[in-house]
């Protein structure tokens, strides 16, 4: 009976170790493409798009006005598409 408990414990510990090793190697593989893409598409601070003074689609419109083509929803207080059926 003791040998069976020990073998089950070792099997379980081995599976946990295998899971941890696989997860660690997978997370390293996922980091590589992110780093590569961020270095390729890095944008200089001078070329960053300036923030607009209006709120876009589904953005809060309490302090800011909605951008053109959007209206502030009276119920939800965020910018929605302007349409003829909207009030």
UniProtKB/Swiss-Prot annotation:
Identify the species of origin. Cyriopagopus hainanus (Chinese bird spider)
Identify the domain of life.
Eukaryota
PROSITE patterns documented for this protein: HWTX_1 (PS60021)
| GO MF assignments | ion channel inhibitor activity; toxin activity
Similarity comment text for this entry: Belongs to the neurotoxin 10 (Hwtx-1) family. 51 (Hntx-8) subfamily. Hntx-8 sub-subfamily.
Residues that make up the propeptide are 25-52
Q: What does this protein do?
A: Ion channel inhibitor.
Which residue pairs form cystines in this protein? 54-67, 61-72, 66-79
Would I find Disulfide bond among this entry's keywords? yes
Keyword check for Signal: yes
Its keywords, alphabetically, are:
Disulfide bond, Ion channel impairing toxin, Knottin, Secreted, Signal, Toxin
- Give the range the annotation lists for the signal sequence: 1-24
Pfam families hit by this protein: Toxin_12
Would you tell me the protein name for this molecule?
A: U3-theraphotoxin-Hhn1c
Q: In which tissues is it expressed?
A: Expressed by the venom gland.
Q: Where in the cell is it found?
A: Secreted
Give me the Gene Ontology terms describing cellular component.
extracellular region
Notes on the domains: The presence of a 'disulfide through disulfide knot' structurally defines this protein as a knottin.
